[in-house]
Amino acid sequence: MYKYLDKVNSPKNIKNMSIEEMDLLAKDIRKFLVKSVSKTGGHLASNLGVVELTLALHKVFDSPKDKIVWDVGHQSYVHKIVTGRKDCFVSLRQFNGLSGFPKENESPHDIFDTGHSSTSISIATGIACARDIKKENYSVISVIGDGSITGGMALEALNQLGYIDTNMIVILNDNEMSIDKNVGGMSKYLSSIIRNSTVEKMTDEVDKILNVTQTGEILSKTAHRFKDKLMYSFSPQDCSFFDSLGIRYYGPIDGHNTKELIDILRKAKHKKGPVLLHVITKKGKGYRFAEEQPDKYHGVSKFDIKTGVTSAKVKSMSISVGEKLVDMANSNENIVAITAAMPSGTGLNLFESAYPKRYYDVGIAEQHATGFAAGLAKNGMKPYFAVYSSFLQRAYDQVIHDVCITKKPVTFLIDRAGLVGNDGETHHGMFDLSYLNSIPNIVVMAPKDTREMELMMDLSLKLDCPLAIRYPRGSSYYLDKGEYGEIVLGKYEVLDDGQDTVILCIGSMVKHALEAKEILSREGINPTIVNARFLKPIDEGMLKALLKNHKNVVTIEDNIVTGGFGSRINKFIIDNEYNVNILNIAIPEEFVKHGNIDELYDFVGLSPKSIADKIRKLVIE
């Protein structure tokens, strides 16, 4: 089916390929990626942009002896294809299938598990230093995007790397995008290198002087070949930032010119000390729809190749949050919105359009975003920081130090709480209830559905304290169960009365609990269902009344079992010496693999059927 790709099952297969053959292989790979991802979904645009770069890396270096560390890792599909996993792409990001990120247990060519941004330079530096201590001889390469290099961890790593002067290569894959358009001073700086390169200016002047006559065309081509050579030379005027750190800069380099890439990688391989190669790529290259809308094809569901159309989408929880925040801001000039490089993913692109002067995209910088929000709150603003649960982990100290100790009224809109599905371990939001539970002075809420989420956002305006609202990935939904009036701080809601057994559930697990009750009621088991709404504070009055009339207490949460909602209820029961049977249903204390969300709920025991089975066993015993 693919003339050149079908011959590749190992990096060894491309070692003797000519440049022309590698370019034809690149075309095959792009066709394969578009066809494959159209059937499974996945990260498309970023992988289309790194085809030539990945092939050049595997031609010049000897993986896995030479260590290639992929930042974030969503752009590692071509690497997986070259290292013998092409036939596994039918199961990409599916349960027990091929991961969308590097996995050490999947291939020896995957040097390190990654998933979050800005980590690769630190990891690669550690590998390089260990190599030096052991007096081993191999290359270490970090591949990082221009969005990721703005992250604090990446800058910290560059600071050390230049100082210790070890042999290492950093490849800066610059496509001017992270997921959305890049922002910030570093992004401007990198763009200025591209725009203002001394060599580019020189060749432009050559073109003008020669006026592109027939003779001029020949001389101009010669000048451009000369330019290509000079591109590899260090330019102190343009690249003083990297130079000042002690890291030698080469670039900008055409990331789609296979020969240029191979030449510069071979030179960098033998350079002493740290080297940074600034490679310019086009996100989505080779597929028109992805080139035109790279943000839409960053992470994409199944789509039609001919039209680029994905399956119809209903409104997401994130969009509902964005719409509600805009509505609140219409009548409150103090509301400001903050994102850490995820405006579309969090729904804040809507706020940006409505109130650009009250909207801040701080880049991949969750720590800074949290401290920044605290400063805004200090000076009278009402900041809302919308952030994925797994990314808020990076700002744990700032949540404590800058927000909660000082009781600043910052609201965290925690998106992607609970299991998220196909992205796996690094992206599940399964720890936030636990890590927020341990922090004083913060109110933590989780709505049963979209309408209750909006009511919780209304409540946030009335409270002058740190506050978090967590909600799941996926479509907006309405349970039409219970009351939808004004929410009172710390008050639970009884959705269904029953006897003997009470189920205390929070957030999206309310829906699962109600479905589990439908199963149990057919067997004569009739538990009381309580929508707890709050991790903290707890509704002590309702809990005392419930514990007097029920002998079995079940808690359900889409969070790790240790330290979260169940643990808080357990403590109340123990402290008040109630004699009841307790069952905590939650995510087991282990990292959860990737897969379809319903398969994962069943896998961890949080599907309605699994919940019903556990409660049945408790009641019968």
Swiss-Prot record:
Catalytic activity from the UniProt record: D-glyceraldehyde 3-phosphate + pyruvate + H(+) = 1-deoxy-D-xylulose 5-phosphate + CO2
Function: Catalyzes the acyloin condensation reaction between C atoms 2 and 3 of pyruvate and glyceraldehyde 3-phosphate to yield 1-deoxy-D-xylulose-5-phosphate (DXP).
Keyword Repeat among record annotations: no
Family stated for the protein in its record: Belongs to the transketolase family. DXPS subfamily.
Molecular function in Gene Ontology: 1-deoxy-D-xylulose-5-phosphate synthase activity; magnesium ion binding; thiamine pyrophosphate binding
Domain of life: Bacteria
EC id: 2.2.1.7
Cofactor note: Binds 1 Mg(2+) ion per subunit. Binds 1 thiamine pyrophosphate per subunit.
Protein name in the entry: 1-deoxy-D-xylulose-5-phosphate synthase
NCBIfam families tied to this protein: dxs, PRK05444.2-2
Lineage: Bacteria, Bacillati, Bacillota, Clostridia, Peptostreptococcales
The protein's required cofactors: Mg(2+); thiamine diphosphate
Keywords, comma-separated and alphabetical: Isoprene biosynthesis, Magnesium, Metal-binding, Thiamine biosynthesis, Thiamine pyrophosphate, Transferase
Coiled-coil annotated spans: none
CDD domains referenced in this protein's UniProt entry, alphabetically: TPP_DXS (cd02007), TPP_PYR_DXS_TK_like (cd07033)
Pathway entry: Metabolic intermediate biosynthesis; 1-deoxy-D-xylulose 5-phosphate biosynthesis; 1-deoxy-D-xylulose 5-phosphate from D-glyceraldehyde 3-phosphate and pyruvate: step 1/1
Binding positions for thiamine diphosphate per the UniProt entry: 74, 115-117, 147-148, 175, 287, 366
Keyword Cytoplasm recorded: no
Gene Ontology biological process: 1-deoxy-D-xylulose 5-phosphate biosynthetic process; isopentenyl diphosphate biosynthetic process, methylerythritol 4-phosphate pathway; terpenoid biosynthetic process; thiamine biosynthetic process
Subunit record text: Homodimer.
GO cellular component: cytosol
